C-alpha cells in the first residue's frame, strides 16, 4: 500500500433533530456579530482549563516545547503529511500527560469527534502493519502544541493537535469567540481490507455514503450542473497555505435542489461540524443559515460508483468542505472543512484587535 501524501511547502453524539434544533436556538439567541457565537464562551473556558491542566503536568523543558508564542509562525503552518511538528508527541508523554492531552481534545470535540480521532490513530497503526513501516506509521506520532497563554484572560491563544491525516486547530479570542478551522480528516486505508483484525472499518464511511446517496438522487439538468469533471480532482484544492484557493463556487446551488436533497447536503456538513461540541456545531450551522443555505453549492467529480476515484465539494460564503478519494485505488481519503471567513480565527482576531484600540 502506497501513501502519496507529499509535503508541498464532552457532549455526546446528538441526533440530527437535536442538532438542528440547538442550531436554531443558537441563531435565535445571538445578537452579536458572527451569528450563533453567543453560546460559545463556555467552550473557550473549558479549553483554557484543560490546556492549563496539561501544561501543569509538564516539566520546564517539556513546557517550553509545548507552549510557543502566539506570534510564532508555526501557528498557521498546518499539514497532514508525516513530518516534524512543534509541541509534544503522544509517544513522548507520560500516561498522565497523555490523559491530560485527551482532555484538551475533549474540551472541544463531541463524542463523535473523539471517536474520529481514535479511529485515525487506529488506522495509522493498520497502515503501519500493511506497509511494514510500524516506526514511521506510529499512532504515538501525533502532537499537541499551544500558542499563547491559556491561563490569561484577555489575549488570544490557541492549540493544534496534528499528525498524519489529522489536523485540528482551535483559537480563542476572549470576548469574541472560538475558531476551529481548518479541520483535516484523512483515511488510509479508507476501507480496511479483509484478513486484517479491523477488516471492514471505514473511518469516513458515513460521510462518503451520504455523498453517494446525494449524487444519485440528482437527475437531469440538476445532476449535470453538479458534475464539474468526469475525473476526480486527485486531491483537495484547499490544502495548507491554499485555504482560499477556491474563489469561485462551482456545481449546483442548493436553491435548485428539493428539500430532501438540501437535507442531504446539510447532512454532510453536519457530519463534519458535528465532530465539534454542540455549541460550536450549532454556531456554524446558524452562520450557514444566516448567509442563506440556498447560496451553498454542491459539486462532484469522478465516478459515481463506490470504490472508484471520486471527489465532492460543498462551497458557500461561510463553509467549504472538500473530500477526495483517489489515491491507492480509491482507498485513501483526504478531506478538509474550512470557514472561509474565519480561517485560524482571522475574523475574530480582527474584531479583537479593533476592540483593543
Regions found by a protein language model. Name each.
Residues 12-18, 28-42:
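N-terminal twin-arginine translocation
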Residues 21-22:
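Sec-dependent N-terminal signal peptides
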Residues 40-60, 65-81, 86-92, 96-110, ...:
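A cross-kingdom marker for long, charged
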Residues 1-14, 25-29:
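N-terminal secretory signal peptides
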Amino acid at each position: 500500500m502506497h501513501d502519496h501524501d507529499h509535503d508541498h511547502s464532552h457532549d455526546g453524539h446528538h441526533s440530527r433533530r437535536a442538532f438542528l434544533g440547538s442550531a436554531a436556538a443558537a441563531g435565535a439567541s445571538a445578537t452579536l456579530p458572527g451569528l450563533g457565537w453567543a453560546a460559545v464562551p463556555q467552550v473557550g473556558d473549558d479549553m483554557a482549563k484543560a490546556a492549563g491542566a496539561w501544561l501543569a503536568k509538564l516539566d520546564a523543558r517539556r513546557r517550553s516545547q509545548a507552549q510557543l508564542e502566539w506570534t510564532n509562525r508555526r501557528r498557521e503552518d498546518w499539514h497532514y503529511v508525516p513530518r516534524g511538528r512543534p509541541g509534544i508527541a503522544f509517544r513522548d508523554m507520560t500516561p498522565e500527560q497523555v490523559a491530560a492531552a485527551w482532555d484538551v481534545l475533549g474540551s472541544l470535540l463531541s463524542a463523535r469527534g473523539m471517536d474520529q480521532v481514535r479511529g485515525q490513530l487506529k488506522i495509522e497503526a493498520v497502515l503501519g502493519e500493511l506497509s511494514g513501516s510500524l516506526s514511521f506509521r506510529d499512532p504515538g506520532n501525533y502532537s499537541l502544541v499551544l500558542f499563547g497563554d491559556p491561563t490569561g484572560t484577555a489575549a488570544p491563544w490557541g492549540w493544534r493537535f496534528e499528525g498524519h491525516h489529522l489536523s485540528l486547530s482551535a483559537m480563542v479570542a476572549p470576548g469574541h469567540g472560538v475558531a476551529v478551522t481548518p479541520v483535516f480528516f484523512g483515511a488510509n486505508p479508507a476501507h480496511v481490507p479483509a484478513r486484517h483484525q479491523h477488516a471492514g472499518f471505514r473511518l469516513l464511511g458515513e460521510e462518503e455514503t451520504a455523498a453517494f446517496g446525494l449524487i444519485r438522487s440528482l437527475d437531469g439538468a440538476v445532476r449535470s450542473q453538479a458534475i464539474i469533471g468526469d475525473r476526480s480532482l486527485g486531491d483537495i484544492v484547499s490544502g495548507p497555505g491554499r485555504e482560499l484557493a477556491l474563489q469561485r463556487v462551482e456545481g449546483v446551488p442548493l436553491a435548485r435542489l428539493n428539500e430532501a436533497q438540501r437535507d442531504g447536503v446539510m447532512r454532510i456538513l453536519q457530519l463534519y461540524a458535528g465532530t465539534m461540541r454542540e455549541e460550536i456545531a450549532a454556531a456554524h450551522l446558524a452562520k450557514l443559515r444566516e448567509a442563506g443555505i440556498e447560496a451553498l453549492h454542491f459539486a462532484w467529480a469522478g465516478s459515481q460508483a463506490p470504490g472508484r476515484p471520486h471527489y465532492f465539494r460543498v462551497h458557500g460564503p461561510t463553509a467549504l468542505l472538500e473530500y477526495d478519494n483517489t489515491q491507492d485505488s480509491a482507498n485513501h481519503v483526504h478531506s478538509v472543512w474550512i470557514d472561509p471567513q474565519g480561517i485560524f480565527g482571522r475574523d475574530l482576531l480582527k474584531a479583537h484587535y479593533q476592540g483593543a484600540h
